[in-house]
Swiss-Prot record:
Gene Ontology cellular component list: endoplasmic reticulum; endoplasmic reticulum membrane
Pfam families: Glyco_transf_22
Residues in compartment: Cytoplasmic: 27-60, 197-210, 292-295, 339-348
Naturally occurring in which organism (per UniProt): Saccharomyces cerevisiae (strain ATCC 204508 / S288c)
Protein name per its UniProtKB record: GPI mannosyltransferase 4
UniProt keyword Cell wall biogenesis/degradation present: no
Its EC number(s): 2.4.1.-
Annotated metabolic or biological route of this protein: Glycolipid biosynthesis; glycosylphosphatidylinositol-anchor biosynthesis
């Protein structure tokens, strides 16, 4: 028992360390969450993503305010934290980590209570040592919150279809289920994809003979949904009547032309590419052992994969809510025990998760967060112009400025990148996000800033993987780059070129630009 407790504390500590790591997994963890909240609560200027523009109104403020609003309210009482973007970021990640651990301790056991103690221990151990638990679940993705909503839903539903409870009316659970359904839908429009098949089974087994309970579920869902609609209508205030964000989001995503902007993938991407990446060696257990067909969780897996694969924009994080189900719902057989107890499986599982945890929890695009966290300490009135090139979009809320101008590269209808909308006349407190544009556009940006008479500091933030490209920039003879700061733990996986091994160089460097 003592040995188990020490092992548990060690895993918790590893999770805490990675939770507080500087990695930056995907722009949406900032722009669909903290960026919006910081602008609401702290009145800083930042980047409004398309989903939160009144024209689209495709994301609900309700779940964000419900999950993170209390934390921001508490932080208002601590100015030393409220003014420090790194502390705000890590506070939010810590909250997510704690919420997931609570779910792990109180809800996951209910999904595996029919298993033998030894099997429960193995499944819980696999889930706790998954890199997804340490990274994706702690970052501020809507997918992370969707996981909690899905597990909560399935826990309640499993309880309702239990033979002991099937004859009861279950008014309380019906009300709870309606509230979670509403929250899940307004948090992410993909939530119904996971619960569609489980809902059909629940209706057939329970609600077709308990119509009063079904009425309560509908009433609860409608009431909470109306509250979310009123919140969004008040905030967006776009003059178009009531704002129903899940409906707007669904309409947007059903248009293939819209999805092309974000990237189209083959429909098998989730099944053949993303699934192996997200569960690793557990996939072997799934292949050899299969899943329990008498559990609603299995149908949530099938339902989620089926409906999410229908859409051609398929990112790995969309499958994050399935990870707990893919692990805990395995059909445990003697072959499963034999495989898990083999040293090669244990070693492969640990190696897979250590590597993925290092990438996703510590080094992936981490220089961005480190620089903006440091910038808080050395910022001055003469910020000048910060040009970001070949990095993920900087989370501009971390500048903590109420006087910030953000310009960005745009793609024209012909797919051509353009800097025509960059505010070259703004020479101070200006962030220019050039994303992954080619070198000529970077050169043109610097040239036009110079032509507009910019005498304030010009700063270039770019990964060390661009060493070869920067040498070409210097050959121009009119530009000199002086390294000011360097961050070793920055992994750029987006610009790897096997014909140029300098693109594998880790790190991010902040340069001062001198115009000769």
């Amino acid at each position: 028992m003592m040995r188990y407790q020490w092992w548990l504390y060690l895993v918790y500590a590893i999770g805490l360390m990675l939770c507080l790591g500087p990695s930056y997994i995907h722009p949406d963890e900032h722009f669909q969450c903290i960026e919006i909240l910081a602008m609401q609560f702290m009145k800083v200027k930042g980047t409004i993503p398309w989903e939160f523009k009144s024209k689209f109104a495709a994301r609900s403020y309700g779940p964000l305010l419900l999950v993170y609003g209390p934390l921001f309210t508490i932080l208002e009482s601590f100015p030393e934290i409220q003014d420090n973007p790194a502390l705000i970021l890590y506070s939010m990640r810590l909250q997510n980590y704690v919420m997931y651990l609570l779910c792990y301790h109180f809800l996951i056991p209910k999904l595996i209570r029919d298993e033998r103690k030894a099997v429960q221990f193995i499944k819980k151990s696999l889930l706790l040592t998954s890199y997804v638990t340490w990274t994706y679940q702690t970052h501020t993705f809507s997918n992370s919150i969707e996981t909690l909503a899905l597990i909560s839903t399935l826990t309640v539903m499993e309880d309702m279809v239990n033979e002991k409870n099937i004859q009861r009316s279950n008014f309380k659970n019906s009300v709870i289920l309606g509230l979670i359904f509403s929250f899940g839908v307004f948090n992410r429009v993909t939530f119904p994809a996971f619960i569609f098949l489980p809902c059909l089974i629940l209706f057939w087994k329970f609600y077709r003979v308990h119509w009063k309970s079904f009425s309560l579920l509908l009433l609860s869902f409608s009431f909470s949904s109306c509250l979310f609609v009123l919140i969004d209508t008040n905030i967006y205030n776009n003059g178009k009547g009531f704002v129903i964000t899940p409906l707007n989001n669904l309409k947007y995503n059903l248009n293939v032309q819209n999805l092309q902007v974000h990237g189209l993938h083959p429909r098998y991407t989730h099944l053949l590419v993303n699934l192996p990446q997200i569960v690793g060696p557990v996939l072997l257990l799934a292949i050899f052992s299969g899943y329990k067909l008498d559990k609603l969780s299995t149908y949530a897996i099938i339902s989620g994969l089926l409906f999410l694969s229908f859409f051609q924009h398929q990112e790995l994080r969309f499958l994050v809510p399935l990870v707990p189900l893919l692990v805990t719902n395995l059909n445990w057989t003697p072959l499963s025990s034999t495989l898990v107890n083999k040293k090669i499986f244990k070693g492969t599982w640990l190696l897979f998760n250590i590597i993925m945890a290092f990438i996703m929890g510590i080094s992936h695009q981490a220089g961005i967060i480190q620089f903006l966290g440091d910038y808080f300490h050395f910022r001055t009135e003469q910020m000048g112009v910060h040009i970001w090139w070949k990095t993920y979009s900087p989370p501009t809320w971390m500048y903590m400025s109420n006087n910030l101008t953000v310009s960005s590269l745009i793609n024209t209808q012909d797919g051509i990148e353009s800097i025509d909308e960059v505010a070259f006349s703004v020479g101070n407190h200006h962030v220019i996000d050039l994303k992954g544009c080619d070198l000529p556009l970077l050169t043109e940006t610097i040239r036009r800033l110079r032509l507009n008479g910019s005498i304030t500091p010009l700063t270039l933030v770019t990964p060390n993987s661009m060493t070869s490209e920067l040498k070409k920039l210097k050959r121009d003879g009119t530009i000199n780059l002086i390294p000011k700061r360097n961050y070793l733990f920055h992994l750029d996986l987006d610009h790897l070129d096997f014909n140029d091994f300098t693109t594998f160089k880790p790190g991010l460097t902040v340069y001062s630009i001198e115009l000769l």
